[in-house]
Amino acid sequence: MTSSRVENSSSRAARKVKLALMGPAFVAAIGYIDPGNFATNIQAGASFGYQLLWVVVWANLMAMLIQVLSAKLGIATGKNLAEQIRDHYPRPVVWFYWVQAEIIAMATDLAEFIGAAIGFKLVLGVSLLQGAVLTGVATFLILMLQRRGQKPLEKVIGGLLLFVAVAYVVELIFSQPALAPLTKGLVIPTLPNGEAVFLAAGVLGATIMPHVIYLHSSLTQHLHGGTRKERYNATRWDVAIAMTIAGFVNLAMMATAAAAFHFNGHTGVADLDQAYMTLEPLLSHAAATIFGLSLIAAGLSSTVVGTLAGQVVMQGFIRFHIPLWFRRAITMLPSFVVILLGLDPTRILVMSQVLLSFGIALALVPLLIFTSNAKLMGDLVNTRWVRGIGWAIVAIVVSLNGWLIVGSLLGVD
């Protein structure tokens, strides 16, 4: 009887530790459903129906492994990826890494900020510039939560992630995708033409986020409670749950676009405004409004995550710190420039996702090297299988980027 009570008590304690350690992956996962995903997935679904769903599936599985490795690095070493690169690489390489990581973070933030501004424009009927001002104010307010510690921010961002997921459950109900072709698109790889390759690279860039690779290792490096092994096991659950939700949202985005647009003859839907306007007569005003609200939620939460990632990158690589509000103010500027110049915001969103795909390998190569180093990682070092899969992911990413560059230069369609 006594031993049974002890076992129950230890089991409850283990569950408490696991729950206490949940959260960082939800912050990371919000980066996987930013407005760049909306733009890329809608364009892919409208243009090719369900044919590119398999890209989302495989990209999400890759992202799960990558986020586990990133989180594991922080747990095992007490340092984030940027700090490890700074400590182990020559100074010119470190500066190169810092510059490209900042560019990637700014490209990400551009997509996220403009996406939220478009959401405000669609739902409230304001101008895009007014939507950008509302986005700026809202992100400043969310970032103020950081003063109270990491947990309150994790809860707010996790709540926004769940809101977007529920919104897309509703969108799927409205759009009623056909199950047979949807299932075929999930399991049978196909790239019909050059545009499909471009969009596949965009989906990859939108699904595997370089700035979040840096951020996740920072979110776990100061975790306390339980043993190192318990922290790692809790983190794996954290990643599995959060990334499954993010993966579902991405699949739902593309499937909804395919069902609502592609199979109703609207294959040219290529921007978020057009998607909103087309959804209303095809499905309902409620479906269009839910789309707009989910875009706002995704944009606000992901732009906050982008700001945090930029801070981690700067502090980690060059040991330089600026206040979060100042970084937020600086990184808003490109978005306002794009809006004031009247550039196509959705095209900017899709292009930013393609740019992101070029930063994946640069973040992933050192991550694999460090997490495969037994001296650094101890008992959490990568197994041979994980190393093999990791390098295969690098090869896939580099090959897709190479194909994209060659196709662009030669004008292949």
UniProtKB/Swiss-Prot annotation:
Bilayer topology: Multi-pass membrane protein
InterPro entries in the record: NRAMP_fam
Disulfide bonds: none
Gene Ontology CC annotation, any one: plasma membrane
Keyword Transport: yes
Record flagged with keyword Methyltransferase: no
GO biological process entries: iron ion transmembrane transport
Keyword line: Cell inner membrane, Cell membrane, Ion transport, Membrane, Symport, Transmembrane, Transmembrane helix, Transport
Membrane-crossing segments per the record: 19-39, 46-66, 94-114, 122-142, 156-176, 196-216, 241-261, 290-310, 329-349, 350-370, 389-409
Molecular functions per Gene Ontology: cadmium ion transmembrane transporter activity; manganese ion transmembrane transporter activity; metal ion binding; symporter activity
Described function: H(+)-stimulated, divalent metal cation uptake system.
Family (UniProt): Belongs to the NRAMP family.
Official protein name in the record: Divalent metal cation transporter MntH
